[in-house]
Curated annotation (Swiss-Prot):
Belongs to the MurCDEF family. InterPro entries: Mur-like_cat_sf, Mur_ligase_C, Mur_ligase_C_dom_sf, Mur_ligase_cen, Mur_ligase_N, MurCDEF_pg_biosynth, UDP-N-AcMur_Ala_ligase_MurC. The keyword ATP-binding applies. GO terms for cellular component: cytoplasm. Its EC number is 6.3.2.8. Cell wall formation. The gene is murC. This is UDP-N-acetylmuramate--L-alanine ligase. One of its GO terms (molecular function) is ATP binding. ATP binds at G120, S121, H122, G123, K124, T125, T126. Keywords: ATP-binding, Cell cycle, Cell division, Cell shape, Cell wall biogenesis/degradation, Cytoplasm, Ligase, Nucleotide-binding, Peptidoglycan synthesis.
């Protein structure tokens, strides 16, 4: 960033172009650079919430990728999701315009800051938001670059005035190990992104490097309720590690006396850190979001706050302003007194956590859980097919659509229908159904929804757009639906 800063100060402002600027990771970095005073523009195939937000700031957005989009740019930023045959990449190579990976640009933003990097197979986005909440409660004003829209900010990234930067660290292509973080959080490690890593051990090795690459004065925060994370922590001696959990009695930070309701969770925390607070109990911490997994996410934030000496008051009250993250158990509508939830869960472990939360709420309301799941990527389904057969136990009624390709080519035998057939044949669920078209979900809701039910629409594809359009879809059939967000 020093070279960019020099150019921004002493020369004509040069333009940074983002290919795929509407992506949640790319849009956040673009917004931060824009707020720092750089000239930013970008392109994407379709308009979305992120492109509209950036355009409202005055950032030039091109719809579609074309050589002429980069006529007057000095740098091009890409993510690993961009095809090397993209015409803008080819043009940049032809004109010898520097091409910068998204992770490298993030690293430059973090280099001169005290940075907190949040990684793990699941829970990164919510944990990043919760960490930011505690920093703000402590009177600090961090820069935040998140992997999801923070509801009370209406953005996934915002510029702060302090020397702290909190970022979600994407592990999908191993670039996260090069991020110059001071504090590293690992929420969990599950088999994911095996199309890149090829095997689970290589993925675990990347998380090991994520910790060991920390400076000697930094520290890691790890959830040892997760057995793979526990083993990793046990094997690392060269860096300071603060542990947390619910079931792990030897963790430095433990949640207990847990009470949950439809919209929140309350718990006590036991802290056992001799060099910080000694053994201390903080009572009645409340997070305004349900779910055991979210309690674990909050413990990661609490661990950071304790190590940085935020104080008991900030830690106890720090989550009061947390309003959640879009697509993380987001209630989007009500139909026939049933709640319709939009959730990003697309991995078996995420699905289990989401449905467990829904089941707990439905039981208290004498309702049932209706799960509508859109699988995401053929490669993920292929690698985790057996795990997908076992992850829907908390759904009373299950519907699975075909796979959202996300740019991948089909794989023979890997389909949503095949998954339903295997689940049914092996009797893992007695009410599993295949939805040939996502639009058929409207009929599912009309036929099944009753008072107290939780209708969970899950996936990383276009099922979210569908969930947010339900009011119009139901109205077109003569049914009334109340939109919540």
């Amino acid at each position: 960033m020093l070279l960019l800063e020099l150019k921004k100060t002493n020369q004509t402002l040069e333009t940074i172009h983002f290919i795929g600027i509407g992506g949640v990771g790319m849009s956040g970095i673009a917004e931060i650079l824009y707020n720092l005073g750089y000239k930013v523009q970008g392109s994407d195939l379709v308009e979305n919430y992120n492109t509209k937000r950036l355009e409202s700031y005055g950032i030039k957005i091109f719809l579609g990728h074309a050589e002429q989009n980069i006529t007057n740019v000095s740098y091009v930023v890409i993510s690993s999701a961009i095809n090397p045959k993209n015409p803008e990449i080819k043009e940049a190579l032809e004109r010898k315009i520097p091409i910068i990976r998204r992770a490298d640009m993030l690293a430059e933003l973090m280099r001169l800051k005290c940075s907190v990097a949040v990684s793990g197979s699941h829970g990164k986005t919510t944990t990043t938001s919760l960490v930011a909440c505690l920093f703000e409660a402590a009177g600090l004003c961090p820069t935040v670059i998140n992997g999801g829209i923070i509801n009370n900010k209406s953005t996934n990234a915002y510029l702060g005035s302090s020397n702290y930067l909190i970022a979600e660290a994407d592990e999908s292509d191993a670039t996260f190990i090069h991020i110059p973080s001071t504090i590293a959080i690992i929420t969990n490690i599950d088999p994911e992104h095996l199309d890149y890593y090829r095997d689970f051990e290589t993925l675990i090795g990347a998380f090991r490097s994520f910790i060991t690459n920390l400076p000697f004065y930094g520290f890691a925060v790890c959830c040892i309720d997760h057995k793979i994370v526990r083993k990793l922590v046990d094997d690392i001696t060269e860096r300071k590690i603060v542990t947390y959990g619910i079931d792990s009695e030897d963790a430095h930070i433990i949640a207990f006396n847990i009470n949950t309701d439809i919209a929140s969770s309350t718990f006590d925390v036991k802290i056992s850190l001799p060099n910080v607070l000694g053994t201390t109990i903080i009572e009645k911490i409340t997070i305004p979001t349900p779910g055991r997994h979210n309690i674990l996410n909050s413990l990661a934030a609490i661990a950071v706050g304790i190590e940085l000496d935020f104080g008991i008051k900030a830690i106890k009250n720090g989550f009061n302003n947390f309003k959640g993250v879009k697509r993380r158990f987001t209630k989007v509508a009500e139909y026939n007194n049933a709640s319709i939830i939009d959730d990003y869960a697309h991995h078996p472990e995420e699905i289990k956590a989401t449905l467990a939360t829904a089941k707990n709420i439905a039981n208290k309301q004498n309702g049932k859980v209706i799960a509508i799941f859109q699988p995401h990527r053929y490669s993920r389904m292929q690698y985790l097919f057996d795990d997908f057969m076992f992850c829907f136990a908390d759904a009373d009624i299950l519907y699975i659509t075909d796979i959202y390709a996300a740019g991948e080519n089909p794989i023979e035998g890997i389909t949503g229908r095949n998954l339903v057939d295997k689940i049914t044949k092996r009797k893992h669920h007695d009410k599993a159904n295949f939805l040939a078209e996502l639009d058929d979900a409207v009929g599912v809701i009309i036929d099944n929804a009753a008072s107290g039910d939780m209708i969970i629409m899950m996936g990383a594809g276009n099922i979210s757009s569908f969930a947010n359009e339900l009011e119009g879809r139901l109205s077109s059939r003569g049914f009334s639906c109340h939109t919540v967000v």
